[in-house]
Structure formats: structure tokens, C-alpha cells
């Protein structure tokens, strides 16, 4: 399916969250014969410690008081099951938070390799 990466280093301040959610839903509803658009949201950090959160399957994996992380989670596509590790029925989100540049490269490679090789 078509893939769109939204890469940011901070919080959106020019429109309300409701508009961001609405636009992301419209984008995710677009489709080709290969399936619906996959919308990835990537929040970059200057910290290259490898502590980024990649492909979370629940908001509990994010900081409880981080509105930006929760918003990106809600805006992101569910990864197709073929991309998700075979460890249950959890649906990973197409997002990362506080990611380094090296983690971004791993995410971009998702269509080429199994998620098991990334995580």
C-alpha cells in the first residue's frame, strides 16, 4: 500500500488537535488496489541513546502525560498484521517517539524487512 511518513521534531502549534486527527483520518482512508494509505508519524529527538519508542501497540507504552505522543499515536495507522511480530494479537502503530536518526532509518526499512529484525 502507499506509505506516507510525517517526520517532526516537536509539537504542532498552528492547528488544533481535532483538525490534525480529522486530516490524518482522511489520509488513512485513501486507497489504491494495494490497500489503504499507511500513515507513519515519526517524532525525532536529538538524543541518540536508542531510547525511542518504535511501533507501540498501546498508549501505555508512551509517557502518560505526553499529549504530543498520544496525538501521534491516534493519528498513526495500525500496521498490517504481516508487519507485526507474531507474539499475540497486538496491533502495533505506525509511529515512533523520541527516535534517533538511526531508528528513523530502521522504520523506513519496514517494507523491506520483518519488524522482528527491527525490534
Annotate each predicted stretch with a short phrase:
Residues 1-119:
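Acidic, low-complexity intrinsically disordered regions
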Amino acid at each position: 500500500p502507499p506509505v506516507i511518513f510525517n517526520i517532526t521534531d516537536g509539537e504542532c502549534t498552528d492547528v488544533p488537535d481535532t483538525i490534525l486527527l480529522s486530516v490524518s483520518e482522511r489520509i488513512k482512508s485513501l486507497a489504491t488496489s494495494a490497500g489503504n494509505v499507511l500513515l507513519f508519524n515519526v517524532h525525532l529527538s536529538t538524543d541518540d541513546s536508542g531510547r525511542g519508542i518504535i511501533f507501540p501497540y498501546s498508549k501505555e507504552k508512551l509517557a502518560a502525560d505526553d499529549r504530543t505522543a498520544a496525538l501521534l499515536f491516534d493519528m498513526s495507522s495500525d500496521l498490517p498484521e504481516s508487519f507485526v511480530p507474531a507474539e499475540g494479537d497486538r496491533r502495533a502503530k505506525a509511529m515512533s517517539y523520541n527516535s534517533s536518526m538511526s531508528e528513523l532509518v530502521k522504520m523506513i526499512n519496514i517494507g523491506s524487512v520483518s519488524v522482528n529484525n527491527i525490534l
